[in-house]
């Protein structure tokens, strides 16, 4: 039975979902360990929703400490078909100003200490990731920004860095030379794992600062980030609410069949332990 149809992952500044009614806390156990926190289940704009605070309530977890596999698996277990992600980012372009929202459609991976797949240990799968976000969810985010009257820029490249330190000036300028738009520490692994779980995914990145590349502008600090987050979290919640309301009920994209031709391992060669661990993802293909 589907417990939730839409998942919301709230990042820095969005630790709860205003307007969520009939809220009940749900603790999920996964084959990959515990998610960042209990998931909050309820209704938002007449839709069944599961909300997860990415860093845990009280912001307890570093980006490198996040159990991305458990977070996405928990959403899958609850029946979630679409994930709306919200996160804080630094801007790598003059045109993306603090308090703007950017809805990226590409990623560059600069992480090195994370697991970004459910597979391995007996199962080999290679999902397509040329277009790493769901166009339907991204467009719904963009339309919701327009409805609320905030700047929501569709498209762009998100650099995902390891952290927890912010960039050096050399790194920031390198990413700018690549044409990247924003920089953050969390969204790439979510996008990869959501694709493997056949869940539609897109993120709305809240610009809080100009990283450290901009001459005549202070380098990014936590104090600066928090100040902008407090200013913008209300708008972020309004956009998410509008996006949930406008989200099409039926999926017409290809996200729901991402694994159809991706599994290379002979079905007869998949170990029993792997089938048990990945049954939720593989059941329709075994």
Question: What is the role of each PLM region?
Answer:
Residues 147-181:
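Active-site/ligand-binding-proximal alpha/beta "capping" segment
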């Amino acid at each position: 039975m589907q417990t939730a149809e839409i998942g919301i992952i709230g990042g820095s500044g969005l630790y709860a979902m205003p307007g969520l009614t009939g809220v009940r806390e749900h603790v999920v156990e996964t084959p990959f360990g515990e998610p960042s926190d209990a998931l909050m289940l309820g209704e938002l704009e007449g839709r069944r929703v599961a909300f997860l605070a990415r860093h845990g309530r009280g912001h307890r977890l570093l980006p490198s400490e996040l159990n991305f596999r458990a977070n996405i698996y928990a959403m899958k277990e609850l029946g979630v078909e679409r994930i709306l992600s919200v996160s804080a980012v630094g801007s790598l372009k003059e045109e993306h100003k603090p308090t703007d929202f950017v809805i990226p459609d590409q990623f560059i991976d600069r992480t090195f200490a994370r697991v970004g797949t459910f597979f391995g240990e007996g199962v080999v799968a290679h999902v397509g990731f040329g277009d790493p976000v769901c166009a339907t969810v991204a467009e719904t985010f963009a339309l919701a920004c327009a409805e609320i009257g905030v700047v929501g820029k569709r498209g762009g490249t998100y650099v995902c860095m390891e952290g927890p330190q912010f960039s050096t000036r050399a790194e920031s300028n390198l990413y700018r030379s690549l044409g990247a738009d924003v920089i953050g520490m969390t969204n790439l692994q979510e996008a990869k794992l959501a694709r493997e779980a056949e869940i539609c995914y897109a993120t709305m990145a809240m610009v809080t600062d100009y990283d450290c590349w901009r001459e005549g502008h202070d380098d990014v600090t936590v104090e600066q980030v928090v100040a902008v987050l407090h200013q913008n979290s209300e708008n972020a919640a309004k956009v998410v609410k509008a996006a949930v309301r406008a989200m099409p009920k039926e999926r017409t994209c290809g996200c729901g069949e991402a694994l159809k031709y991706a599994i290379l391992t002979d079905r007869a060669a998949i170990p029993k332990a792997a089938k048990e661990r990945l049954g939720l993802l593989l059941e329709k293909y075994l």
